[in-house]
Design a protein with these regions (language model features):
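Conserved small/polar residues in nucleotide/adenosyl-binding loops
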Residues: 228-235
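Conserved metal-phosphate-binding beta-hairpin within the catalytic cores
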Residues: 147-182
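Short acidic, Pro/Gly- and aromatic-enriched capping/linker segments at domain boundaries
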Residues: 14-30
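Low-complexity, highly charged intrinsically disordered N-terminal segments
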Residues: 57-143
């Protein structure tokens, strides 16, 4: 059975059996090698595409990212290592119903994070109830005593949150971590989508893919709601 590579990813020949380690969930195919429902159309497209042509377009994407400086740094070593953003021509497809369920769960999680922070900087009921050890908060470098009693606009402390998710099975997701202090990576997502649109426009004409280009507008609107507003001179 043939296998091919796009960047650092490895895929089984779409015409053959699946070679994904059984310990991991295969996003694209079921255990019988048939495509999962969200990937049915993409799988049909992939099987008729020319392998050399696909690899060439993958190289074009990497060349574009390198030329335009779309990279990220890996810190923690003696020197920062600049790398290209991961680009995969086999997309991770999430169906609309699945996305709606994830959205509700993520929104609930972010509300819980903000409620926790509001309690920590106000009544501290979660500490008095013994649910969270006091020392865990008091000795945490991220805890700011000067914020005690401060009420941010809308009671929102975490304005932008990056939730790292991993799928472990059909309709089963887990949160790896909540990036709530300095989340990053949105620009990579925007550039990735723009590159996919340029290299594979036919995929977007055949499938109803939700746009991501409106993210900057939504971000601006969200941040605008958090501004402190001072009374107008006419109101005084």
């Amino acid at each position: 059975m043939r296998c091919f590579h796009f960047g650092t990813a490895r895929y089984a020949d779409p015409m053959g059996r699946n070679e994904v380690d059984s310990r991991y969930f295969d996003e694209m195919r079921r255990t019988d090698a048939a495509p999962r429902a969200p990937y049915a159309g993409y799988s049909d497209w992939l099987q008729v595409e020319d392998l050399k042509g696909l690899m060439q377009r993958a190289r074009e994407a990497e060349t574009f990212f390198r030329r335009t400086g779309i990279t990220f740094n890996v810190y923690g070593q003696s020197e920062a290592d600049e790398r290209l953003i991961p680009f995969d021509i086999v997309p991770r497809i999430i169906a609309a119903k699945e996305w709606a369920r994830l959205t509700k769960g993520i929104e609930q999680r972010v509300r819980a994070i903000n409620a926790f922070l509001h309690d920590i900087y106000h009544r501290q009921e979660i500490l008095r109830a013994g649910r969270v050890p006091v020392d865990l908060i008091a000795r945490n470098e991220a805890f700011l005593p000067l914020m005690m009693g401060v009420e941010p606009p809308g009671g929102i402390y975490t304005h932008i949150v990056g939730i790292d998710l991993v799928r472990t099975g059909e309709n089963e997701f887990f949160v790896l971590e909540d990036n709530a202090r300095t989340p990053s990576g949105v620009s990579y997502m925007l550039e990735n989508r723009a590159t996919m649109l340029q290299l594979f426009p036919e995929l977007f004409t055949k499938n109803r893919v939700r746009p991501v280009s409106n993210y900057p507008t939504l971000l601006h609107k969200s941040l605008g709601c958090l501004l402190y507003t001072s009374p107008s001179p006419r109101d005084s």
